[in-house]
């Protein structure tokens, strides 16, 4: 090959490579963006992922545009939302991800309890604070007429029976019994958050 032919070949190759990396590439990126397929949700339902504390699956559901306000599919269940069940099991990161993604913070289950009622009663300060920071109604009343604060200011001996009931009905059968010491020691912190 002659020196001129080699130079021409290098010049042509440079033009082709430059053209391949130039404006037409950005057009193809735009074309790809327009035709990109949204991510698929994971196999686990959002409700079950929220109940189990599976943050990765919850984030996948959020990215896929899954309805964040799905309810407990169990006909005999409390009809809690994904956020309510995450709060009930103290899955802080899941609850905060759902709150930040726009889950309904004012939803009421069949007992009239909102996620704020649930998080505060079960003494999860970070979830309680995140709900208040997002604008949860502190004055929302459950079906018994109580606000989250009303229940929290009752003496322990008056509410322990309720904890015993839900512990026996829900938590112990699932192998995650309530931590009474954590709850008792955190009640005053929850009251401060609710009053702030």
Task: Mark where each language-model region is.
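C-terminal motif of bacterial Sec signal peptides marking the signal peptidase cleavage site
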Residues: 19-20
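Bacterial Sec signal peptide processing site at the extreme N-terminus
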Residues: 23-32
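Ankyrin-repeat boundary/"N-cap" motif
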Residues: 39-48, 71-82, 108-114, 141-153
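Ankyrin repeat structural motif
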Residues: 54-62, 91-100, 124-132, 158-168, ...
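Ankyrin repeat A-helix N-terminal signature
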Residues: 48-53, 85-91, 118-124, 151-161, ...
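Ankyrin repeat (ANK) tandem arrays and their immediately adjacent linkers/low-complexity segments
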Residues: 138-196
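Bacterial N-terminal signal peptides that target proteins for export
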Residues: 2-10
């Amino acid at each position: 090959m002659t020196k001129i032919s080699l130079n021409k070949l290098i010049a042509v190759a440079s033009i082709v490579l430059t053209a391949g990396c130039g404006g037409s590439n950005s057009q193809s990126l735009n074309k790809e963006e327009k035709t990109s397929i949204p991510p698929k949700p994971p196999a686990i339902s959002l409700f079950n992922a929220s109940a189990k504390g599976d943050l990765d699956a919850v984030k996948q559901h959020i990215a896929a545009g899954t309805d964040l306000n799905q309810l407990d599919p169990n006909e005999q269940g409390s009809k809690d939302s994904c956020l309510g069940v995450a709060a009930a099991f103290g899955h802080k990161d899941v609850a905060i991800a759902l709150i930040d993604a726009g889950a309904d913070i004012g939803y009421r289950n069949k007992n009239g309890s909102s996620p704020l009622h649930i998080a505060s009663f079960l003494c999860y300060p970070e979830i309680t604070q995140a709900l208040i920071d997002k604008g949860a109604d502190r004055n929302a009343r459950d079906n018994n007429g109580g606000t989250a604060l009303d229940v929290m200011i009752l003496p322990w001996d008056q509410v322990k029976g309720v904890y015993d009931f839900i512990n026996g009905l829900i938590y112990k059968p699932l192998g995650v019994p309530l931590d009474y010491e954590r709850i008792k020691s955190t009640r005053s912190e929850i009251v401060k958050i609710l009053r702030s």
